[in-house]
């Protein structure tokens, strides 16, 4: 990983070394900000024979009042860097939420990613389920990076991220059960306990 938080271990000794170096480290990424976050947990995954890495996300676009399926063949790297340096590598498919995702949306995304024929069905099933998840759970972002194609033509989400609209969480008590308060701003957590929304404006922030 770009911040040093992802390692490939091929032996038990390598695993022990990486685990000891990552736990308690201060991980700095674009998501954490310059202050970083202390690593308290490790996620261990099986290694796979990766043939291709893709990027896939779904998010609302307030300017058009539509949902955007955003995808790129430049998976496994920062999508912000891709957008800045090679925006032509990002494809966008706009979906009217009143109609929902249709076959032509799924095909547009699949063809835009140059999906092999053998992966078309599993990819379109995954994308449709991902869209429904984003809409049904009031997500402000659902992201898979990377979405991989293996040498055996399996389509697998290696890493995923979901952002929920805090103002809609009351409709999803099941989601609240997954909250990790250690990863949230303590001041925001305390304010939320009193039914308040707290927004930190930074050291020099002001209103009015």
PLM features: residue spans?
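ATP-dependent carboxylate/acyl-activation modules
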Residues: 1-144, 148-208
